[in-house]
Amino acid sequence: MLLAQSTPTAATLVQQTSTIPIIFFSVGDPVGDGFVASLSRPGRNATGFINMEGSMSGKWLDLLREVAPHVRSVAILFNPATAPGGGSYYLKPFNAAARSVGLQATAAPVHTVSEIAPVIAAQARPNNGLIVMSDAFPLAHRMEIVTLAAHHRLPAIYPYREFVDAGGLLSYGNVLRDSYRRAAAYANRILRGEKPSELPVEVPVKFELVINLKTAKALGLTVPSTLIDRADELIE
């Protein structure tokens, strides 16, 4: 049995074997990326768990506007090589959501670590904000991204609390540790004889909103009480 914690890893494993059971998690679009035939009936040797649906980018935009209502232009950072659908999975709903509220939307792709700093610096203008896509590459380089956003005083929202633990402003997304537990349960079912082809791909059931009040203060932002009341955790 093989476990894949990201879209690139799942893609590699699916290409390498059609017989060994594969359980993936932290994957965005398993149908679009060709890992399974459908969510309800994977039909192959792989199954697992979606981390977030594409529409989540609209939610990130809404939350960023709540904490930083002055923002008029928002960029979304991702690596096309590791993001689901090369980034299009989240980009399409992000662009639509931005248009609906009259904001300028910008794609901010990065291909290497060395590109992160200039891409973030390019967004460091008054009334700009940043969304970091749910993607293995930004997660792996979260310290650099968070540090640069703070340096440029750029309001940013992230997909996982790990970014906020590192000093990021706020995050909203599924709980990674819950995905690990659910993947372990699927592994147990497969070891007991069930087939991956018949185990449906499941969506997240737990989401969390985490806000770093210290970072908000450093950015000169006042977090609305309505947002504080909805937070699962406040970091002070």
Q: Which functions belong to the PLM regions below?
A:
Residues 1-236:
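Short hydrophobic alpha-helices and adjacent helix-cap/hinge residues
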